[in-house]
């Protein structure tokens, strides 16, 4: 993948996350801010999740209360380079834990 393809895929992912958060109808208040390719999710309990793109490595990084994860694009999904888990699955789990209710990204 070249830099242009990486940016397009990363932009699509960020847009998907923003659209999901904008439609979220749960009780938890989840705010997000995107600045310079970094998305920060803020939860009522003061915790945060940070998602950013690492252009030189063509990776998406995810930082949660539970730890940090690095994702590489494999076919149609972003896959963790340590656990093999899908980005959307890990993000949904982390958001659900930090929000105190089920949050699903699809």
UniProtKB/Swiss-Prot annotation:
<comment type="function">
    <text>Involved in iron-sulfur (Fe-S) cluster assembly. May act as a regulator of Fe-S biogenesis.</text>
</comment>
<dbReference type="GO" id="GO:0016226">
    <property type="term" value="P:iron-sulfur cluster assembly"/>
</dbReference>
<keyword id="KW-0479">Metal-binding</keyword>
<dbReference type="InterPro" id="IPR036524">
    <property type="entry name" value="Frataxin/CyaY_sf"/>
</dbReference>
<dbReference type="GO" id="GO:0008199">
    <property type="term" value="F:ferric iron binding"/>
</dbReference>
<keyword id="KW-0408">Iron</keyword>
<dbReference type="InterPro" id="IPR002908">
    <property type="entry name" value="Frataxin/CyaY"/>
</dbReference>
<dbReference type="InterPro" id="IPR020895">
    <property type="entry name" value="Frataxin_CS"/>
</dbReference>
<protein>
    <recommendedName>
        <fullName>Iron-sulfur cluster assembly protein CyaY</fullName>
    </recommendedName>
</protein>
<dbReference type="GO" id="GO:0008198">
    <property type="term" value="F:ferrous iron binding"/>
</dbReference>
<dbReference type="InterPro" id="IPR047584">
    <property type="entry name" value="CyaY"/>
</dbReference>
<comment type="similarity">
    <text>Belongs to the frataxin family.</text>
</comment>
<dbReference type="GO" id="GO:0005829">
    <property type="term" value="C:cytosol"/>
</dbReference>
<dbReference type="Pfam" id="PF01491">
    <property type="entry name" value="Frataxin_Cyay"/>
</dbReference>
